[in-house]
Amino acid sequence: MSKEDLIEMQGKVEEVLPDSRFRVTLDNGHQLIAYAGGKMRKHRIRVLAGDRVSLELSPYDLNKGRLTFRHIEGRGPRAPQRGAR
């Protein structure tokens, strides 16, 4: 599956679960289980209950997601990513 096939959404972390998983409520009200993406683990980005996050969903399973960005209050949305080098 290519990166273009993923659905990008935003939501709020409701609960921190074991094994670096999180219960997230999307802006449209849908709840799902998400895990921290590889770069978030690598850079030890801490995600707490109540944080606003961006996540990617597979079009094949809308009940699981991958956290890709933690939004910090007072900072604007992240810049769009450039293509691969």
UniProtKB/Swiss-Prot annotation:
Localization of this protein: Cytoplasm
S1-like domain location is: 1-72
- Kindly give the PROSITE patterns that the UniProt entry links to this protein: S1_IF1_TYPE
Instruction: Provide an example Pfam family for this protein.
Output: eIF-1a
Q: Which of UniProt's keywords are assigned here?
A: Cytoplasm, Initiation factor, Protein biosynthesis, RNA-binding, rRNA-binding
Would you name any one GO CC term?
cytosol
Q: Which CDD domains does its entry note?
A: S1_IF1
Mention one GO molecular function. Answer: translation initiation factor activity
Assembly, in brief, is: Component of the 30S ribosomal translation pre-initiation complex which assembles on the 30S ribosome in the order IF-2 and IF-3, IF-1 and N-formylmethionyl-tRNA(fMet); mRNA recruitment can occur at any time during PIC assembly.
PANTHER family of this UniProt entry?
TRANSLATION INITIATION FACTOR IF-1, CHLOROPLASTIC
* Main function: One of the essential components for the initiation of protein synthesis. Stabilizes the binding of IF-2 and IF-3 on the 30S subunit to which N-formylmethionyl-tRNA(fMet) subsequently binds. Helps modulate mRNA selection, yielding the 30S pre-initiation complex (PIC). Upon addition of the 50S ribosomal subunit IF-1, IF-2 and IF-3 are released leaving the mature 70S translation initiation complex.
Sequence similarity: Belongs to the IF-1 family.
Q: What is the name attached to this protein's record?
A: Translation initiation factor IF-1 1
Q: Which organism is it from?
A: Paracidovorax citrulli (strain AAC00-1) (Acidovorax citrulli)
